[in-house]
Amino acid sequence: VWKTFFMKDGVWLALAFMLLYRLPEALSVKMLTPFLLDPPEAGGLGLSTAQSGLVYGTAGVIALTIGGILGGVYAARKGLRKSMWIMALSLALPCAVYLFLALVQPERMWIVYACVVLDQFGYGFGFTAYMLYMMKFAEGEFVTSHYAICTAFMALSMMIPGLFAGWM
């Protein structure tokens, strides 16, 4: 199974894609909780754990789900190849909302909610393309095993950058 996976056409390009596609999210997600909870004088937003849970764990999850569903609809209509750039940008660019939040330090919670919802919606929308790409790449004789290998690289793509996120 391993041999057939690494003999697939374009395997090294596919692995580079799998390892780099989620890089912005991999770097930002590890620092998100400290950013939300740290006091403003330390560069954070000073949210309580309840506020953080509500904004990220509730509003964010709802936006992520809606983004994923709409990403699937979009990719089904346009095709994965035609939609890849839009979906990749929708995953990467919303991470900039945290730069905005860090610079502005808003006191109004609705601004924080709107930014987190935008980020999570974009992540859900863009992540759909990533999943579809792995499904497409895994096609062939050992589709289930090859997809499992792809998901292992997906996990690795979040773990390795996460190790360095706090130093940046």
PLM regions with names:
Residues 61-69, 158-159:
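Residue-level signature of mid-helix packing/kink "hotspots" within the transmembrane helices
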Residues 49-50, 140-150:
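Loop-to-transmembrane helix entry/capping segments in MFS-fold secondary transporters
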Residues 82-130:
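C-terminal transmembrane helical hairpin of 12-TM major facilitator-type secondary transporters
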Residues 66-85:
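Helix-to-loop junctions at the C-terminal end of transmembrane segments
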Residues 21, 30-52:
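Short amphipathic helix-loop junctions that connect adjacent transmembrane helices
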Residues 33, 71, 161-166:
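Small-residue (Gly/Pro/Ala) motifs that create kinks and tight helix-helix packing interfaces
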Residues 19, 54-62, 89, 117, ...:
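Transmembrane alpha-helical cores of Major Facilitator Superfamily
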Residues 1-13:
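Juxtamembrane intracellular "pre-TM" segments in multi-pass secondary transporters
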